[in-house]
């Protein structure tokens, strides 16, 4: 299995990448290994207005680099080595937009844990599941934005949808911020955070604009609670206003083993 041998890059590597496994793939590939406690097939979350769909996919390669050519080169190697073994179902090319903004014009990832909060603690499994310590639960969703509807909103209304100022990223005051603002419903507690690695993507000729959500977490319970707050509401019905303009067309849970474990799995 070539993809198991390429997970550990040389220390001088210029770009990071991650190999991730869905529950069914883990069962088939590593039947003797045991399994991360929370790795299971994602069950859709259906609210009154919006649905976090569940879609298939056994493997995910998350490739990042400052130069798109490096991403292409590495993806080409993966594709060549896995020919006849897997069937590609999706390939999304993200890009950095306007100093970290999403396509909708607001800074993305502001709510990530700060450096002094130790992001590693929120993103990586610890000794609570010792056999898989150093790994991470990774949930991905591909969101398509209705840019016509979004751009029809005045900036002040867009800011109420997100809960932050558009041009300086300052959070709205509690008096200004609606209960269903995006950053209100996704804030489920200071001790319940994830690390986002979201990227915008676009195909202008097709009128397709979106955000590829990638959330790394030490426990999927946190991510699911966040999704339930967005799609069902807490209280029920107080759903994320951003979902009126953004539709999730995929939804899959993966697990990223640590470098050391993945090396062992590939032996």
Enumerate the language-model features and the residues they cover.
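Short, small-residue-biased leader/transition segments that mark boundaries at the very start
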Residues: 5-20
């Amino acid at each position: 299995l070539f993809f198991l041998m390429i997970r550990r890059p040389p220390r001088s590597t210029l770009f990071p990448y991650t190999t991730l496994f869905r529950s069914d793939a883990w069962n088939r590939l590593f039947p003797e290994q045991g399994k991360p406690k929370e790795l299971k097939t994602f069950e859709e979350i259906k609210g009154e207005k919006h649905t976090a769909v569940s879609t298939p996919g056994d493997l995910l390669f998350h490739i990042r680099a400052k130069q798109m050519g490096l991403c292409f080169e590495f993806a080409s190697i993966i594709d060549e080595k896995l020919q006849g073994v897997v069937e590609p179902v999706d390939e999304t090319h993200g890009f950095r937009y306007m100093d970290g903004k999403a396509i909708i014009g607001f800074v993305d990832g502001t709510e990530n844990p700060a450096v002094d909060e130790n992001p590693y603690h929120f993103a990586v499994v610890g000794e609570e599941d010792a056999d898989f310590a150093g790994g991470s639960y990774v949930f991905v969703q591909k969101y398509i934005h209705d840019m016509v509807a979004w751009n029809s909103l005045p900036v002040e209304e867009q800011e109420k949808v997100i809960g932050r100022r558009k041009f300086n990223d300052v959070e709205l005051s509690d008096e200004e911020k609606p209960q269903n603002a995006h950053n209100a419903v996704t804030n489920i507690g200071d001790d319940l955070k994830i690390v986002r690695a979201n990227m915008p993507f676009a195909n202008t000729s097709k009128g397709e604009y979106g955000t590829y959500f990638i959330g790394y977490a030490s426990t999927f319970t946190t991510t699911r609670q966040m999704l339930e707050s967005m799609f069902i509401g807490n209280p029920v019905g107080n759903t994320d206003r951003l979902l009126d303009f953004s539709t999730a067309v995929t939804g899959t849970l993966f697990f990223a083993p640590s470098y050391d474990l993945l090396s062992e799995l590939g032996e």
